[in-house]
Structures are given as structure tokens and as C-alpha cells.
A protein has these predicted regions:
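Active-site mouth of glycoside hydrolases
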Residues: 61-302, 424
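Sec-dependent bacterial lipoprotein signal peptides
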Residues: 1-15
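Extracellular glycoside hydrolase catalytic/binding regions
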Residues: 101-103, 215-232, 236-397, 410-427
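Acidic carboxylate-rich catalytic motifs and surrounding loops in phosphoryl-/glycosyl-chemistry enzymes
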Residues: 401-406
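Bacterial Sec-dependent N-terminal signal peptides
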Residues: 13-60
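A short acidic, helix-capping loop that chelates divalent metal ions and anchors anionic groups
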Residues: 140-141, 193-194, 337-339, 408-410
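Short gly/ser/thr-rich secondary-structure transition/capping motifs
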Residues: 56-59, 110-113, 305-311
Length: 430
């Protein structure tokens, strides 16, 4: 199943095509590596003063968010995998036609089960980080269907995450951490414009969902509280107003703007960000100093000049805590085939991020998703070389969405878009 990602300029999923570079045989062994990161950064001190659960200190291995983003470099999204879900309350096909096992969800959108060898391939070729998108609603509480495949969200009860699902998420995170890579773990298609989304950017939406949202992050934070600095939590993916407006809040309103809807949406986003930060910090263990990530409205990056409201997701965002262990994330998709005419717009994007986020808030920025519109490896490589080069100059890590290794190529594992992969790595290594 294909999942469309929408942005102001373009949207795309990148599926299997083109030449492929295969990971050497010696790297396809499912070896059990030592968990150096978690052991090195387990900072619950008990030696001298007996203060069990004492908060970790900076000199015990944790770094600032600004340091972390520089160390990440090139990243990739393990997309259409743990984020897979039915996505339609009128057609809950996974729930209706499967046993609802972790594998049923992980493979529902056409990707194989994630392996350690796949993650190792990214490490071997020079990537520094992997974002692990996770959709949680199918695995929280009890979802009861009617008419075989329909879901009335008002009947949703309970907030406990299925232990089997949490265990699989943890296993995949361990693959990333064990390779010495940074890992971003998030709340993904619980947001967006689908009818199964339950997190909406509005004051009313926040009040309705805040208890469930807090309960979810309490469970995630507790599960991973002893992990070291290479694990980052991301608050939510692309949260939209109740109208499902992309680009900026209330874009789908009559006249393409409604000040009241927009204000409520930006207030809602800021409230979710604040609750997320407070919940993680209160959860104990290494979460007191863990680097966390909050996204702008819709993860919008202010691309374009066709509306005076395009910069609002940046200018209206309020940082939920003092800078130090927090970063802001945006997403940015482009038409790779029209790249030559977009260079100046890409340049402006990085100026806007610097002006409205880095300098205004004193916070580092992550581009958590980016990509081109087509599956053409050569045109994407040309575009990626320029975009990644500008990001490297700005000190911003970028996470390409999906297609570098896709579908059956992940099983080998090998590259689906080797030229694009190489262009990204070269840009960050210059």
C-alpha cells in the first residue's frame, strides 16, 4: 500500500527501481552485538551516595542538541514499516483481515520485516542516523470494529500499548543503537489528514486528546529511559488542524485562511509540544537530559512565497523549554526534475530556517523528511547533492524519506537508489 506524503510543493514515495549495490556477505550476518551505548550511558548512579535513579549529569556522556545534530549528518527514514496502519476509519483492513500481530502491521504496506543487516548497510556506507517512524493507535487500548471493518473512534477505550508491539519497536531501535547510529523514535500517522488520526492541532483537539497523548509518551519514555544519548524522542509527526490543512494552518478554510482556526491550531501545536517535553522530563532515568525533538505545525518549513501565511508555522511556534536538549524539526519535498529552477528557493529555505528558528529560538534544526517527486535515481541524485550540501553548510542533518532502499531490496539488503545515496553521503563528507 502506498502512503502519500503531502507538502506545499511536492510529495512522493520512492519505490524500488534502478541499479542496486549489495551489502557484502560478511555484513549480512545477524550477529549479536554488545549494547555499548546503553551500557556506557546508563547513568543511574548508586555507588557513593546511594541515590538510586539520580539524574544523569552532562559529563557522563550526554551532549547538547546542537552537538547531536552536527554528529548525525546524513540520515534515512525507515518508512512504511512500523508506521503502517489502515489509515481509514471506514476501511480498517489490517484489523479486519489479519491477526493484528506486529508482523501484520510492519509488512502491511509492502515492506519486509526490518533486519539488523539492513541497518548495518546504512552504517557501512556512512549514514549517521535513522529515523524510526511508528504509528501507535492500532496498538493502544482496544479498537472495536463495526460492520466488519469500520471504526468509531469514540468507542476507543484504554491507553495501554500492546507489549508485543512495544517489544518489536524496541528491537528495531536496538538494531539502530547497536550500530552506533543516532535513532529518532516518534509518533507518526497518529497525526496527519487521515480519518484515523487522533492528534489534531487545535485548542479543542488538545483538550480532547491530551490524556491519551500523555499516557502514550509515559509508556515510551519509561521503556527507553535507560538508553543513552543516541536515542532521541520526536513529539509528533505532521500534526494538522481539523480541516487537514497543509502548508499553514487553516489553508483548507473558505478563502484559504481563517485567523481563528489558525490561532487555535498554533496554540494546539504549542500545547502538545509543551506536554511532550514535560512528560519526557518527568519520566526519570536518562530522559532528564535526553535530546528531544518538537515539530512545527505540519512539520512545515515555510517553503515558497505564494502566500503571506507560509512562514507562520515557523514564526508562531513556541519552544516548550529552554534550549539545550531540544531541537525543532521540519520536512521539505521538492520536484527533482525541476531542480535547476528551484535552487534559489532551496537557498531561501535555509535562510528562513536560520532566521525564524535557529536565531529566533536559539535552537538547532533537523530536516526529518525530504525527497524528490520521482523515482528517477539520476535526477534525485542531482537534486540531493545540492540540497544535502546546503544542509551540511547550515549544520542541519537530513533524513531522506524511504526510497534509498525499498521493498525487496531491503531483504538482500541493497540500494534501490545508489546514485542518490552516494550523492547524499558525498555532500556530508565534503
Amino acid at each position: 500500500m502506498k502512503r502519500l506524503l503531502i507538502s506545499c510543493l511536492a510529495a512522493a514515495l520512492l519505490f524500488s527501481c534502478g541499479d542496486a549495490n549489495v551489502l557484502p556477505e560478511q555484513y549480512r550476518q545477524n550477529d549479536q552485538k554488545t549494547k555499548e551505548e546503553k551500557q556506557e550511558n546508563n547513568n543511574n548512579q548508586e555507588e557513593e551516595n546511594g541515590n538510586q535513579g539520580q539524574e544523569p549529569q552532562e559529563d557522563e556522556g550526554f551532549e547538547t542538541a546542537a552537538e547531536a545534530v552536527v554528529h548525525m549528518g546524513a540520515g534515512w527514514n525507515l518508512g512504511n514499516t512500523l508506521d503502517s496502519n489502515s489509515g481509514d476509519a471506514e476501511g480498517m483492513w489490517i484489523e479486519a483481515w489479519s491477526q493484528r500481530t506486529p508482523k501484520d502491521y510492519e509488512t502491511a504496506w509492502g515492506q519486509p520485516e526490518t533486519t539488523r543487516a539492513l541497518i548495518h548497510m546504512f552504517k557501512e556506507f556512512g549514514f549517521g542516523a535513522i529515523r524510526v517512524p511508528v504509528t501507535w493507535y492500532p496498538h493502544m487500548g482496544t479498537i472495536t470494529l463495526y460492520d466488519n471493518d469500520k471504526w468509531d473512534q469514540s468507542t476507543w477505550t484504554g491507553t495501554a500499548v500492546d507489549p508485543a508491539w512495544m517489544a518489536r519497536v524496541k528491537e528495531v531501535v536496538d538494531y539502530v543503537i547497536d550500530e552506533g547510529l543516532y535513532c529518532i523514535l516518534n509518533v507518526h500517522h497518529d497525526t496527519g489528514d487521515g480519518s484515523t488520526a487522533w492528534l489534531h492541532a487545535s485548542e479543542e483537539g488538545f483538550l480532547a486528546a491530551k490524556d491519551r497523548y500523555q499516557a502514550l509518551w509515559e509508556q515510551i519514555a519509561d521503556t527507553f529511559k535507560d538508553y543513552g544519548k543516541r536515542l532521541l524522542f520526536e513529539s509528533y509527526n505532521e500534526m494538522l488542524d481539523p480541516l487537514g490543512s497543509w502548508c499553514f494552518a487553516s489553508f483548507n478554510a473558505p478563502g484559504s485562511y481563517d485567523a481563528a482556526v489558525a490561532t487555535s491550531a498554533y496554540n494546539g501545536i504549542n500545547s502538545y509540544a509543551k506536554l511532550f517535553a514535560e512528560t519526557v522530563r518527568a519520566s526519570g532515568g536518562n530522559n532528564a537530559l535526553r535530546n528531544i525533538i518538537v515539530n512545527t505545525y505540519g512539520a512545515c518549513s515555510g517553503d515558497g512565497t505564494w502566500s503571506s501565511h507560509l512562514k507562520e508555522p515557523l514564526t508562531e511556534f513556541v519552544l516548550p523549554e529552554e534550549p539545550g536538549h531540544i531541537a525543532v524539526q521540519v520536512h521539505s519535498y521538492w520536484n527533482d526534475e525541476a531542480f535547476s529552477s528551484q535552487k534559489s528557493d532551496i537557498d531561501k529555505l535555509f535562510v528562513n530556517l536560520d532566521t525564524h528558528l535557529v536565531k529566533r529560538l536559539g535552537v538547532p534544526v533537523i530536516i526529518g523528511e525530504w525527497g524528490g517527486k520521482t523515482k528517477n535515481d539520476q535526477s534525485n541524485a542531482t537534486f540531493a547533492a545540492y540540497f544535502a550540501g546546503k544542509a551540511k553548510e547550515a549544520g542541519i542533518p537530513t533524513f531522506w524519506w524511504m526510497g534509498l532502499s525499498d521493498g525487496d531490496d531491503r531483504t538482500v539488503p541493497r540500494w534501490t537508489m545508489p546514485k542518490t545515496m552516494g550523492a547524499i553521503i558525498q555532500a556530508y563528507n565534503q
